[in-house]
């Protein structure tokens, strides 16, 4: 049974991920329901599971609507966030394995953006059609990282270190298309960095053609993401504070 992975842009910059195996699908962080329902119905697919990385409205807002259409779909979320994701049916925590679409996913605690943020990893051996994949929500972005709404620079540094330990080929399926802005900011911090400049130019070309820059890869983030390259929590904190107040010209 072959698998495929699809990115579905919604709202201003959200990206939903839809993982398909056979005639079933799982969706990650559905901000809204209708585009997902339309996408699945056009392909005659059944929704088997919803994966929630954290509780923010632009990640869980569509789940109740999906459950109205597919009431038997599982909702996998952090047990520590039950009060904020009350419709979860499978509660998980760091180190857990959870079966989705017949495959075993690993759960990682990557709390920083929020206090109970998790990521889901599909190891390559579990689904060779996809290769290794991480659904990382708003912790790791392509070329950046999430704002620290409920965590500290030390929390984010720890979370990014955990993600950086995944295989280089791991697809980074984050939840927003922020790459161009993230890399423009990074160039201004490191104007002589060839890896960042080359990646930025490639992303600008993609976006001008109307294409997504996602997914990235762990290897690419190691090379050209200043937050993932930060040697300490203090350095990451300085970068994050600067980025929080930065606006593109």
From Swiss-Prot:
It is an enzyme of class 3 (hydrolase). Pathway: Secondary metabolite metabolism; methylglyoxal degradation; (R)-lactate from methylglyoxal: step 2/2. Transmembrane segments: none annotated. Its EC number is 3.1.2.6. Binds 2 Zn(2+) ions per subunit. GO terms for molecular function: hydroxyacylglutathione hydrolase activity; metal ion binding. It catalyses: an S-(2-hydroxyacyl)glutathione + H2O = a 2-hydroxy carboxylate + glutathione + H(+). The keyword S-adenosyl-L-methionine does not apply. GO terms for biological process: methylglyoxal catabolic process to D-lactate via S-lactoyl-glutathione. It comes from the Bacteria. Zn(2+) 2 binds at residues 58-59, 138, 176. Keywords: Hydrolase, Metal-binding, Zinc. Its cofactor is Zn(2+). InterPro entries: Clx_II_MBL, Glyoxalase_II_hydrolase, HAGH_C, Hydroxyacylglutathione_Hdrlase, Metallo-B-lactamas, RibonucZ/Hydroxyglut_hydro. Zn(2+) 1 binds at residues 54, 56, 113, 138. Monomer. HAMAP family: Glyoxalase_2. Thiolesterase that catalyzes the hydrolysis of S-D-lactoyl-glutathione to form glutathione and D-lactic acid. Belongs to the metallo-beta-lactamase superfamily. Glyoxalase II family. This is Hydroxyacylglutathione hydrolase. It comes from Parasynechococcus marenigrum (strain WH8102). The lineage of its organism: Bacteria, Bacillati, Cyanobacteriota, Cyanophyceae, Synechococcales. The gene is gloB.
């Amino acid at each position: 049974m072959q698998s495929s992975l699809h990115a579905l842009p919604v709202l201003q910059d959200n990206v939903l991920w839809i993982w398909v195996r056979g005639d079933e699908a799982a969706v990650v962080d559905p901000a809204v329901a209708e585009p997902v329902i339309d996408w699945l119905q056009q392909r005659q697919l059944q929704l088997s599971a919803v994966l929630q990385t954290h509780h923010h409205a632009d990640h869980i807002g569509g789940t109740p609507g999906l459950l109205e259409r597919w009431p038997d779909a599982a909702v996998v979320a952090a047990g520590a966030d039950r009060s904020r994701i009350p419709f979860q049916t499978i509660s998980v925590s760091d180190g857990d394995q959870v079966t989705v679409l017949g495959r075993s996913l690993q759960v990682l605690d990557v709390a920083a953006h929020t206090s109970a943020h998790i990521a889901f990893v599909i190891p390559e051996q579990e689904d060779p059609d996809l290769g290794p994949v991480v659904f990382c929500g708003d912790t790791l972005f392509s070329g950046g990282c999430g704002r620290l709404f409920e965590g500290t620079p030390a929390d984010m540094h720890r979370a990014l270190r955990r993600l950086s330990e995944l295989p280089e080929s791991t697809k980074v399926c984050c939840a927003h298309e922020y790459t161009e802005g993230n890399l423009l900011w990074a160039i201004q911090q490191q104007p002589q960095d060839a890896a960042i400049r080359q990646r930025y130019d490639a992303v600008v070309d993609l976006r001008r053609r109307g294409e997504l820059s996602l997914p990235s890869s762990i290897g690419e983030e190691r090379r050209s993401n200043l937050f993932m390259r930060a040697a300490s929590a203090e350095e990451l904190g300085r970068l994050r504070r600067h980025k929080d107040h930065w606006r593109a010209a």
